[in-house]
Amino acid sequence: MSKVKKNEETLSEVLVDVNRVTKVVKGGRRFAFSAYVVVGDKAGRVGAGHGKAKEVNEARGKAKQAAKKRMMKVPLYQNRTIHHDVVGKSGAAKVILRRAKAGTGVIAGGSMRAIFDSLGVHDIVAKSIGSTNVYAMISATFDALNKLASPKSIAMRRDKKVNEISVKSSDIQVNE
């Protein structure tokens, strides 16, 4: 994950999960709230964070600060979709992210949709397999987003030009 400087005014915030948690002590039960927040600038930067406090608003604020610390830059194709299909895993959760043509929209469920909206993705197809736990789904989605690479970065890594690694499907010859 690459660290990115944050600009407070342009970040959108989505509250993904709020949960009341209990700590049992000698004198009884102590209640608190945990919150999970996704923040993004709708231009290729996104982060997620978790916070816990006695009040919901405090927990949300802590989660937002944690999310801003964990923001990452994601390479987008034409500022609307991802460059290539990718799979991410976290525990029993598995997500498959597929690029989509213009006009397709965001086809994703729950917490994944919050990430893509905050990221600024307009066309993507996402499928979740296995666990549907919010924390696992977000972690698996971030794992997949970490695996994304632009053709330019792949070309630099291989010491080649972009047109040498980008191949059209019509250029592939199949020997039968």
Curated annotation (Swiss-Prot):
The cross-references to Pfam families, in alphabetical order and at most eight, read:
Ribosomal_S5 (PF00333), Ribosomal_S5_C (PF03719)
| Protein keywords | Ribonucleoprotein, Ribosomal protein, RNA-binding, rRNA-binding
Describe the location of the S5 DRBM domain by residue ranges: 11-74
Q: According to its record, what are the GO cellular component terms?
A: small ribosomal subunit
- Protein function: With S4 and S12 plays an important role in translational accuracy.
Q: What is known of its domains?
A: The N-terminal domain interacts with the head of the 30S subunit; the C-terminal domain interacts with the body and contacts protein S4. The interaction surface between S4 and S5 is involved in control of translational fidelity.
Q: Which family does it belong to?
A: Belongs to the universal ribosomal protein uS5 family.
Q: Which NCBIfam families match?
A: rpsE_bact
What is the name attached to this protein's record?
A: Small ribosomal subunit protein uS5
Recorded source organism is Rickettsia felis (strain ATCC VR-1525 / URRWXCal2) (Rickettsia azadi)
